[in-house]
Swiss-Prot record:
CDD domains: Hfq. It comes from Bacillus licheniformis (strain ATCC 14580 / DSM 13 / JCM 2505 / CCUG 7422 / NBRC 12200 / NCIMB 9375 / NCTC 10341 / NRRL NRS-1264 / Gibson 46). It holds the Pfam family Hfq. GO terms for biological process: regulation of DNA-templated transcription; regulation of RNA stability; regulation of translation, ncRNA-mediated. The gene is hfq. Keywords: RNA-binding, Stress response. This is RNA-binding protein Hfq. Transmembrane segments: none annotated. The lineage of its organism: Bacteria, Bacillati, Bacillota, Bacilli, Bacillales.
Length: 73
């Protein structure tokens, strides 16, 4: 049985669909933009033409503007 990585599926889907997302950081700061890439430790967000590399351990929540369809089976 294949292990499902929901985090990677979610991030990859919002990246592929260029979905706008609000990223809530643990310190309360909010970033709005699009996910351009990610790896095991970081997420690259682009907002207003500027890129920010955010460490995943600093992120609390991703809130996409629209629902994300995942294949969980």
């Amino acid at each position: 049985m294949k292990s499902i990585n929901i985090q990677d599926q979610f991030l990859n889907q919002i990246r592929k669909e260029n979905t706008f997302v609000t990223v809530f950081l643990l310190n309360g700061f909010q970033l709005r933009g699009q996910v351009k890439g990610f790896d095991n430790f970081t997420v690259l967000i682009e907002s207003e033409g500027k890129q920010q590399l955010i460490y995943k351990h600093a992120i609390s929540t991703f809130a996409p503007q629209k629902n994300v369809q995942l294949e969980l089976e």
